[in-house]
A protein has these predicted regions:
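Short amphipathic alpha-helix that is part of the acyltransferase structural core
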Residues: 1-75, 82, 89, 155-195, ...
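Short loop/turn motifs at secondary-structure junctions and domain boundaries
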Residues: 48-55, 201-206, 360-362
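A short, internal acetyl-CoA/4′-phosphopantetheine-binding micro-motif in the GNAT/acyltransferase core
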Residues: 90-100, 232-243
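Conserved acetyl-CoA pyrophosphate-binding loop and the N-cap/start of the following alpha-helix
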Residues: 99-111, 244-248
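Conserved GNAT acetyl-CoA-binding A-motif
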Residues: 109, 114-128, 258-268
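Active-site/acyl-donor-binding loops of N-acyltransferases
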Residues: 139-159, 236-402
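Amide-forming acyltransferase catalytic core, primarily the GNAT-like/NAT-type
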Residues: 144-236, 243-256, 287-288, 298-311
């Protein structure tokens, strides 16, 4: 008999905080030295986790009274091609080593995704610790993170903007509202609620700064969050609503050239920045970032936008999902007039794919043509071409790690 069948599965409460914290600390090896380096004391990190248990759904597996595995889902909103989706960000996925291999995590994931299905959350995302493991459970890569280093002499010098930059406090209202505006116009971006902002700042040092770019009408149009340490400017995040704000922030970075030797930063636009600067001989490293999974295909398609210029298409998509049975069948979909609906009308084409492939396709990370070339989609090539015609193709911007 599988020992996992004798364990108890339930949602955590605030009384479970000590065990929740201990499991996180052990699994992710957060040491006292690391806490001290970022200004945290053990009792403070425990206290800061109260909102997680209060506002997120944390499902745990107990061996007797002992918490041995957990799976947390943060409720968030996400921009998918300008449609706002209620999604779940899966995090704090961890199990004590002696309990691995018993199917505990798979069972927790099924229960967690089933609860999302009941709550109307049709999409889930996470930052993976093991891409092969999540592949096996129907997840797929949906975004990239590009890290880059720029030497002081390579910082753009021929940029200027008519506005100005001001440093503001971490809790500045304009700063938070600016991110909300950015999220509303950026495919893939998450809307940060109070809990997401708390997690955003959790490990930052006290010397971390926020600089906001304002245009000549005093309207905030961009910001950067950064720390200067050991002659390096570490930029945690830089977003902008337009080219003017982007230039204004680079001008602000250049103003620090006498204080720093290098700039280290990341971009989540999946577009290398070397082309944008005069001296593009820089080091850039690309790696997969977020993974995603459609929780409920039928519900996801209800609000899914498509290209109104792609014409009308009626197609059968045969989806394989070994984890969630309500997704494991054929969906007949009509794409027309910028939207899609399930239909009983005769289908022109038929394609077959797994739930992970469908997820990365509809999020825009890969085209149907590329997935077909990789043998991730089965069917006729003309069907693949028509499907690409009706879909938008833009890689999601996902920068949050919760």
């Amino acid at each position: 008999m599988n020992p996992a069948e004798n364990y108890t599965y339930r949602y955590l409460e605030t009384d479970d905080l000590d065990q929740y914290n201990a499991l996180l600390r052990y699994t992710f090896q957060v040491t006292e030295d690391e806490l001290t380096a970022t200004g945290w004391k053990d009792d403070e990190i425990k206290q800061s986790k109260f909102p997680v248990l209060e506002r997120a759904d944390v499902l745990g597996c107990f061996d007797g009274e002992n918490l041995v595995s957990q799976f947390a889902v943060y409720p968030l909103k996400m921009n998918i091609y300008d449609a706002v989706y209620h999604v779940g960000f899966v995090t704090s996925v961890c199990t004590y080593p002696e309990y691995t291999g018993n199917g505990i995590m798979k069972r927790l994931m099924i229960q967690g995704l089933t609860q999302m299905h009941k709550e109307g959350k049709s999409f889930a995302l996470l930052y993976p610790y093991s891409i092969p493991l999540y592949h096996h459970l129907g997840w797929e890569i949906i975004s990239n993170k590009i890290s880059y280093n720029i030497k002081d002499r390579q910082i753009p010098t021929k940029v200027s903007a008519p506005g100005y930059v001001r440093r503001v406090a971490w809790d500045n209202t304009e700063f938070h509202e600016l991110h909300s505006h950015f999220a509303s116009i950026t495919h893939g971006c998450l809307f940060r609620n109070a809990l997401a902002w708390e997690e955003y700042w959790r490990w930052d040092e006290d010397d971390t700064n926020v600089a906001v770019y304002y245009n000549v009408k005093d309207k905030p149009c961009g910001y950067m969050v950064y720390l200067i340490k050991n002659d390096i400017m570490h930029i945690k995040e830089m977003i902008y609503l337009n080219r003017e704000a982007q230039k204004g922030l680079w001008e602000y970075i250049h103003a620090h050239d006498s204080m720093i030797d290098e700039v280290h930063s990341n971009t989540y636009f999946s577009e290398p920045i070397a082309f944008e600067i005069d001296d593009g001989d820089i080091k850039e490293t690309i790696r997969p970032y977020a993974m995603g999974r459609i929780v409920d295909v039928a519900s996801f398609l209800e609000d899914y936008p498509c290209d109104p210029d792609g014409g009308e298409l009626c197609i059968d998509l045969e989806i394989e999902d070994d984890l969630l049975p309500w997704n494991d069948h054929t969906f007949r979909i009509r794409f027309a007039d910028g939207g899609c609906t399930l239909t009983d009308a005769p289908a022109e084409y038929h394609l077959k794919m797994g739930i992970g492939t469908l997820s990365t396709l509809l999020l825009g990370y890969k085209t149907a043509e590329r997935l077909f070339e990789l043998e991730r989609i089965e069917g006729r090539e003309d069907a693949v071409e028509r499907l690409d015609d009706v879909l938008f193709h833009k890689i999601p911007y996902i920068s949050d790690y919760i």
